[in-house]
Amino acid sequence: MHLVGGAPPEHPEPARPKPASRVAMLSMHTSPLEQPGTGDAGGMNVYVIELARQLAALGTEVEVFTRAVSSRLPPALEIAPGVIVRHVPAGPFEDIGREELPAWLCAFTADVLRTEAGHAAGWFDVVHSHYWLSGQVGLSAARRWGVPLVHTAHTLARVKNASLADGDRPEPEPRVQGEQEIIKAATRLIASTDTERRHLTQLYGAAPGKVDVVAPGVDLDVFRPGDPRAARKRVGLDPDTQLLLFVGRIQPLKAPDVLLAAAAELIHRDPDRRGQLAVVVVGGPSGSGLERPDSLVKLAAELGITDIVRFQPPVPQEQLAHWYRAATAVVVPSHSESFGLVAVEAQACGTPVVAASVGGLRTAVAHGTSGVLVHGWEPADYADALERILTEERWRRHLSTGARLRAASFGWTATAKGVLASYQAAISPAAVAV
């Protein structure tokens, strides 16, 4: 820095690294273009596509590499100015389970490297990998291109294995080892919450100084408050219905069965409530094309609540916002969540959330202000929290107001700026190379 009218300093400041102008974003196992709530598509899909769009809006071009699941997909598709999704042929042109994908890592990596070879030298400034499979690809790509690797885990095997639900399979040891390798070698790590940061440092030995906490965002233009009665009519419900809503993939980890059991408990306590209550599950089974998960259909029958339970296939975000606005409460009883995007989307619509007190849900939901956090998975405890919301209008309005205020701080612009800061730290000469 030079002072006007004076001599230059004896020891000039080092030049600042140039901003990241192009980023290779890796999302091997799930395309950001897939409908969340189907197969393995979920909050990470929303994260990748919204982050890419916002980064481009701030001046950073993004190329997202994802596995091609159909021969009809174009090799490259520009989905927004500055955002290209590249469909990489690796394995069969169909959805396959995540447990089968490690066999196709080499093929995916080779095609990513081949694509970059068609660009000018030094095309990408940063590699940003999402989930451990992409992290393995990112290690190779970053080393080949001589650029830093920034990694976002989204979920961690050791955390999931410590909180398995009944019927869940533990994550395999190769995943644990793969995550360990990525966390050690990555230039920067992005965690969604302070809790995830602690998991990275305490369970995987990540250097605290290279972990950046950047909360995911929510589209506050799409997910916004509205008239609940009008929203209920729009989704085909009576305006006076008290709606309990679950949104997400149907799998033991997400515990939708807890909501069904809690609803049955509410009716047991007050049989007259049956005519007012509705339970809607918006989502599809993980890794299956079934429209309705058989296990939940059977559970509803066993609990005697088939008449009040409705299964809704996954819907686009604009339609999902109507469901959130229609709900009296959104229930998120997951056994593990690195953040809990559904909880924030619901709160942005002014809907109170009843969630498990685990992981990132402790950050997403302000207990007693925007919703209620429940310890454990006893249906009666969820019924207690829901009963108060259903019966005490003043309490429900208090939580609704708090929900809107809570969600207001989770915009995608803030997320993108935080991620850009992590990129800059990775590019800095002081950063540790991959």
Curated annotation (Swiss-Prot):
Q: Where is this region: Disordered?
A: 1-21
The GO terms this record gives for MF are: acetylglucosaminyltransferase activity; D-inositol-3-phosphate glycosyltransferase activity; magnesium ion binding
Q: Does the keyword 4Fe-4S apply?
A: no
The entry marks the following residues as binding Mg(2+), namely: Y324, R325, A327, T351
Sites where the protein binds UDP-N-acetyl-alpha-D-glucosamine: Q35, P36, G43, R249, K254, V315, E337, E345
Question: Which of UniProt's keywords are assigned here?
Answer: Glycosyltransferase, Magnesium, Metal-binding, Transferase
Which reactions are catalysed by this chain? 1D-myo-inositol 3-phosphate + UDP-N-acetyl-alpha-D-glucosamine = 1D-myo-inositol 2-acetamido-2-deoxy-alpha-D-glucopyranoside 3-phosphate + UDP + H(+)
EC number(s) in its UniProt entry?
Answer: 2.4.1.250
Matching entries from Pfam families are given as:
Glyco_trans_4_4 (PF13579), Glycos_transf_1 (PF00534)
Q: What processes in GO biological process is this protein linked to?
A: mycothiol biosynthetic process
- Please list the residues that bind 1D-myo-inositol 3-phosphate: H29, D40, A41, G42, G43, M44, N45, R98, Y131, T155, R175
What task does this protein carry out? Catalyzes the transfer of a N-acetyl-glucosamine moiety to 1D-myo-inositol 3-phosphate to produce 1D-myo-inositol 2-acetamido-2-deoxy-glucopyranoside 3-phosphate in the mycothiol biosynthesis pathway.
Q: Which family does it belong to?
A: Belongs to the glycosyltransferase group 1 family. MshA subfamily.
Indicate the quaternary assembly: Homodimer.
Looking up PANTHER family in the UniProt record yields: SULFOQUINOVOSYL TRANSFERASE SQD2
Any idea what this protein is called? D-inositol 3-phosphate glycosyltransferase
Q: Which organism is it from?
A: Parafrankia sp. (strain EAN1pec)
